[in-house]
Curated annotation (Swiss-Prot):
Keyword Amino-acid biosynthesis attributed: no
Phylogenetic lineage: Eukaryota, Viridiplantae, Chlorophyta, Nephroselmidophyceae, Nephroselmidales
Protein name: Large ribosomal subunit protein uL16c
Any GO CC annotation of this UniProt entry: mitochondrial large ribosomal subunit
Family listed: Belongs to the universal ribosomal protein uL16 family.
Keywords: Chloroplast, Plastid, Ribonucleoprotein, Ribosomal protein
Superkingdom of origin organism: Eukaryota
Major localization class: plastid
Subunit structure: Part of the 50S ribosomal subunit.
Amino acid sequence: MLSPKRTKFRRPHRGHRRGRALRGNTIAFGDFAIQALESSWVTSRQIEAARRAMTRYARRGGKIWIRIFPDKAITMRPAETRMGSGKGSPEYWVAVVKAQKILFEMKGVPETIARASMRIACFKMPMKTRILQR
């Protein structure tokens, strides 16, 4: 699963999930792409599940580009802990995805296989998505 090697700060603020992506919202590498239609956090597990689904359906054919990276640590407190005593420890990593951001791209496979594999990957995502073609 994806995670940064090192970060400047261990425990970032949660931030706001509003607005749309001003960069990374066009197809750059492949012929087909998955585009987010809503803002959301995508965990490294969800990214890996979508990548695996796409590569398995395409039978390791073609090339896949992952256009997002989980660089935000999400902290959690232990169960049944009293309030106070600081912020929790980092548990998992998420990519902050805004609406219209391209998540995955694919090239080198027929259109039917590309669309079918991307449709499976879309079900792994926590937001509404659509499939684009160059």
